[in-house]
Amino acid sequence: MATVINNAMLEAILAEIRPLIGRGKVADYIPALASVSGDKLGIAISTVDGQHFAAGDAHERFSIQSISKVLSLVVAMNHYQEEEIWQRVGKDPSGQPFNSLLQLEIEQGKPRNPFINAGALVVCDMLQSRLSAPRQRMLEIVRRLSGVADIAYDPVVARSEFEHSARNAAIAWLMKSFGNFHNDVATVLQNYFHYCSLEMSCVELARTFLFLADRGIAPHLDAPVIAPIQSRQVNALMMTSGMYQNAGEFAWRVGLPAKSGVGGGIVAIVPQEMAIAVWSPELDDAGNSLAGVAMLEKLTQRMGRSVF
């Protein structure tokens, strides 16, 4: 029988996971991320029937980083036909590091999926082509989905990432050489880094991503965020490609669609039931939150939830 969810259960999971602190490494490739304390632990759940649970540092905001790639894809789905998106970016796992150029060169500038850096940059390039103010549009959508009006970009993080953008710029220019990048590289990179610099808490992330647990419907909004088939497709991509090259191991241990970021956050979806957000800044070798994955593993075992 599945366990009933409550805050005490979440607190107990955090207590069990806390000994893992110190085994991972906080992202240090930009100073703004390296300064975050590694001992943070947070978890939040929002359910489709309107319940909300939280424990630990669930109300503290952090840099969501690559979790934003899901949101930029959702925005693109609202402004492009399906074939327009998928002729420029694939739907398959890459099996390579998220910032690899090797596979991109071999496959002639078409990224494997929208959740590696190359794929997310193509999506951002598409948004630049179709939206007059892509950064403002993203902020509006996140604030609307979360119901929180003061969510914002962290300009220090965005600037720091832009100052250390050589590899991402190389990815963009390589795709441009293959005709799969249409706008000014610096402009699109600025948009991309601003999306990554969004500061949100576990509580805000769980509420923001709840639409993916309910066939594209956010409970507090009048219109669907995306169509039911699109919600299913996004969840499928999260399952196969949301945890970088560790997607298979994560499916084995947790069994849910999820997306991670190097800020230490992970969002996971239990279809038709709930959205879960966890945060622990120390990362494993693949760039996923070490304690965050363990939290989700404990939680799914305790709840008896999995898509398998």
Curated annotation (Swiss-Prot):
Its UniProt entry gives the catalysed reaction(s) as: L-glutamine + H2O = L-glutamate + NH4(+)
Per the UniProt record, which residue ranges are transmembrane? none
Q: Which residues bind substrate?
A: 66, 117, 161, 168, 192, 244, 262
Q: Could you state one GO biological process linked to this protein?
A: glutamate biosynthetic process
A single Pfam family it belongs to is: Glutaminase
Q: Which domain of life is it from?
A: Bacteria
What does the record note on quaternary structure? Homotetramer.
What protein family is recorded? Answer: Belongs to the glutaminase family.
The identity of this protein, by name, is: Glutaminase
Origin organism of this chain?
Klebsiella pneumoniae subsp. pneumoniae (strain ATCC 700721 / MGH 78578)
Gene label:
glsA
